[in-house]
């Protein structure tokens, strides 16, 4: 991902304030609610029958935290996202057979959650930088599919 120095600083500054536990659970939960077909990859998580069930599901929250932990690793290696996410790309492609479009959807949901959580601090300029990052992460995660 090509970010200017200013964009990298904006992303790092905002991300340093993110509560990975909460934001991860909310982002994954929203993905499962807004795009219900993504739930098929999480059948072992139990109750996903309603938005409240999804958003309150401890397994969704735990996996969301794990997802954002990996995203945090990516932020530390913006110049090598493909390498950073190579193993996760292989896992999601070869073993889990996740539709790579889901990575893009999750990135966009994450941007929505950040906007909701940070309000005016999540300026259009910050959003533009994050959109580049989530697009780069989605591309890196989809790499094994090509």
From Swiss-Prot:
The modification Phosphoserine is found at residue 50. GO terms for molecular function: haptoglobin binding; heme binding; hemoglobin alpha binding; metal ion binding; organic acid binding; oxygen binding; oxygen carrier activity; peroxidase activity. Keywords: Heme, Iron, Metal-binding, Oxygen transport, Phosphoprotein, Transport. GO terms for biological process: hydrogen peroxide catabolic process. Red blood cells. Residues 2-146 form the Globin domain. PANTHER family: HEMOGLOBIN FAMILY MEMBER, HEMOGLOBIN SUBUNIT BETA. Heterotetramer of two delta chains and two alpha chains. Belongs to the globin family. This is Hemoglobin subunit delta. It comes from Leontocebus nigricollis.
